[in-house]
Amino acid sequence: MLLNTVTKQLYDGAKGVTVIPCHYKLEYQEWADFGTGSNRPENIYADDSDILSKTTKDSSGKDRLDNGHYIQTTGQHYVLIVSDDSVEQALISMSSSQGKISRGWNSMMMSISLDGKKGPYTPPSFSHAYKLTTVLNSGKGNQWYGYKIVKEGPVTDSAIYERAKKFYTSLASK
C-alpha cells in the first residue's frame, strides 16, 4: 500500500500510481532512537551542511552525533500524483535502503535527452511521468516494502504540465 499522509488516500502498491516529479531536495535529518524522541526529526540540515563530519559510525552503520542522535540522509521527492479523476501534490521521502532507488530515479531523469533548436538538452523533471509501485525486498534476515520506479513517458496533458511547472516554481524559489 501507498499512503498520502496529507489526504489519507490509500493506493494499491502493486498497481502503483503515476507520479510527475517536480522538485528534489537532499537533506540530513537528525533522529532520536525509536521510543526516545518525538517520533519526528529533531533537526533537519540542508544538503550543503557539514553535519556528517560531526558524526561517527556506530556498530549498525548509523552516523551518530555526540548527543546520541543519528543522521539519516533523505531524498525528498516532491511530486504530483495523477489519477483518472484527480491530481494531487505529495512528498515521497526516501532514506536508508530506498536511497539507492532515489539516486537511480534522479539518474533516470537526468539521462533523458531531447533534441532542441540548440541541440540536445535535458528537460525538466516534470516533463515526464513515472509509475511508482511497491515491491517486497529482503536482506540480512529482514523483509520490507520498497519503491520501484519505471518511466512511463512524456507528460502530454498541457494543463497537468503547467500545474507541475507551477509546483516546481513554488518549491525551487525556497
In which residue ranges do the predicted regions lie?
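OB-fold ssDNA-binding interfaces and closely related basic DNA-contact patches used
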Residues: M1-V87, G139-G141, G146, K151-D157
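Short acidic, glycine/tyrosine-flanked loop/strand segments centered on an H-E-D-like triad
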Residues: V79-D115
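Long, compositionally biased interface segments
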Residues: N106-K174
